[in-house]
Amino acid sequence: MDNDWTRGSGAGNDQIHANDMFYLNGDFHLYWSVNYWGKDKHAVHIVHAQSKDALGAYTEPNKKTWMDNRIDPKVFRDDDGQLYMYMVRFTDGNTIWGRKMKNPAEFAGEPVCQFASLPDTWETMDNRVAEGPWVMKYRDRYYMMYNANHTSTEWGNYQLGVAEADSPLGFQNGNKYSYPVVGCNQTQLEEKQVDLLRYGRTYEPLFAYTESKPGSDWTKVTYDDSGWARGETGFSSREVKGSTTRHLGTLWNTPSLWLRKTFSAGSETGNLALRVAHDGDTRIYLNGTLVYEKQGRDYCIVNLDKKLRAALKEGTNLLAVETNKGRSQFFDVSLFDMKDGIADDILMTPGQPNILRGPNGFEWWLIYMANKNDEHRGQYINRVQFFDKTLFVDGITGPRTAGYHPEPSMPTFAGKGETASFGVLQQVQPSVAYLFETGVKTEGGAGIVAWWKDADNCAYVGLDAENRSWYLRTLVGGKENKESYALPEDFRWGVYHHLRIERNGGCLKIWLDEIPAPGRHVFAEALPVEEAGVPGVFDETKSALFEGATYTIGFDDVHFQLSGNEELLKGDFLNDYEFSFQLSGLSGQDKAGSYPVYVDKDNYVKAQFDGITRMLEVTAVKKGKTAWKKEFPLGCLQTLYPDVKYTDFIEKGYRFAAPAWLDTLYLNRHEAGNKSEFVDDMFGKFDIEYLNGGEWHPIENKDRGIAEHPAYNYCTFTPVKAEGIRFINKEAEDLERHIYKIGVHELWKESYNFRAVRRADKLYLFVDGRELGALDIRYPASRIGFCSEGGSPVYSGTLYYHVGQRRD
């Protein structure tokens, strides 16, 4: 930094964090937070500098004062070119604000509060924090991803949320998603798998412990520990209020500690995963067999191998622990029954999000920081999907996470580095649907070839310096048409500008500098629908430069409806591709779906949602005969968070994205505000109703009791079609929350997201982000299609693209 207001203080370059950067019209703009809390002064401000070169040097245009308060700047450019800055202020905890900008260095309006974190939600598990905003626009919707809770692993609650709005400054508490989109994977582990050390027939959290060294046989089941004290694990010398990772169960201030915990296991007990957090040297024994030993500090999960699991026996078992004080003082342990699964690493505290396009131009990727086990923070990346317009993240994942989590897809063709004009692409597959983009540096008379079949059938998108305009020039059958549109007054020549086109049949969409081209963006009938071609670049001056050309076969955001027994085929014949869509308007009587693989009428794979069987039915046909058929049940357990628009301490309201058929509810038996209070029948505290057709109806339970996971009560009922569920406290004087998240067994619903990935002879299938299977297929290059049998299904948010080969 080089400015007047930090000079002579302790606020130096080592206090810079939370950078944001963007390129506009030849300049790189860098924004950062100064986060200095010193005895000489406090300097907690947002700063701006700019440079002609990405690597600097950067100069602050205003050295006298800072740009704004306080931290986490993010600049977003809307489709009309208007700039907005989002930042965090310390007004109600850490609060997110937005502000219109005059230019990259100046503001044009007053700050507008977007939101703070809400009490009694996942956002306030510890501290009042909403920070790290990242704003993007896609499919005509605005998305803000943000962090909530304290960033430190000492709490372990840092998570990522999303708000979705219809204007850049329209984010508010009511349009937040009710749930975190990326959180700690231990939450799901604890909800799905039973911790044998805490749950038997009921909640049994107490361990026997002593602070005096016991006799030599203390690790054996037969040892008499009746003289030992009893306490809940989470042994610590201090309380970290709201912490998940270092929850205080019992105070511990001596150098060493010995623990014993008996638990039951049966023939149904499966694989075991030991989760342990300790600050000093620790040994853990299972029925006298050493299963864990480590010096110093750690926080990890250990999947016990076959040899170590052999120590487990039917009936009563004993876990014994010796642990010691480290630099700090904490110990906690869990033992999960994984059934036939394997536990992942501990992945937690995702934060500081950046959402960027992937290398192929179609995908979106989330880049963020997170922690694995007790390691230092690292960089993580996960795919961002859109279920039509709902943002979904395939994460949090790490190196050992089960399932299909590929690297970012490569384009069909990628040109690296700076080059002169290379004309139209050679030796690439022509197509009627593709994306092409590149950087263009010109004084005029250059641009991209949007479509090339031959000299009489082609299209050009060019920059015209003489007329300060851009143009689309097409030739179809030798007949020429040219349309020109004015460029912004401040458009600079001789610097790089980004051009992007998407062709889908006859439609051509054009972007300039990553926003819709000024004047006109969509040309619905610019090209012949069925005439395949390739893109490229052109330079009439022989002095232009191009950088980073990308060509990917595919299309984005097709919206259409089928009716009756109808089929629609699309796409090129490829061996590697991804294909997804949101399917709506499903009834309980019809079938609708797609051809994730279609070679011809006698060779294909069909995947259909069947409302009668409530299955995804997948059929492979070869040479006109059924080769195999698989059925994947669509019924599943969903976790719902209360919708703040319909929730307070008296009534808890939950909404479904689409009407769904339900037959079972699950409630956590721990009181929402006090986990140590364990309730025998949580359902007894509420009147429960479901919403259908705008009217509320009571749920009449058939059976209720303790679920397979003892932390939950269940309630079964005759299946109902519901748009929402609400829980109303039965007693008028009862003003407690009691519950937060609920479990819902969903049988069927009116809308699903479907995704298929073909990688040569393997086909991966997903529904609503859940991987159903990886199927072996053997077909030549194929395209995709859509199909219905009765009904009028609607397909929206359709995305299809080639997965190119990596070329290093």
Residue ranges of predicted features:
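Aromatic-lined ligand-binding clefts that engage carbohydrates, nucleic acids, or primary amines
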Residues: W228, F263-G288, L319, T323, ...
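Short, solvent-exposed beta-strand-to-loop segments that form ligand-recognition rims
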Residues: V291-Y299, D513-V534, V767-G785
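Short tryptophan-centered beta-strand motifs in secreted/extracellular beta-sheet-rich domains
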Residues: P73, F436-T438, G494-N504, L508-L512, ...
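Short, aromatic/His-centered strand-loop micro-motif at the edge of beta-sheets
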Residues: V476-H498, K622-C636, W748-N753
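Aromatic, loop-rich ligand-recognition surfaces of beta-strand-rich domains
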Residues: L634-E700, I706-W748
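Surface loop/turn signatures of beta-propeller and other carbohydrate-active proteins
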Residues: M1-D20, G38, G56-R77, P104-W134, ...
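Accessory carbohydrate-binding/adhesion or oligomerization-edge regions at the termini
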Residues: K192-G249, R260-S264, L308-D340, G588-K591
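Secretory/extracellular carbohydrate-interaction modules
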Residues: S421-Y471, V476, S563-T626
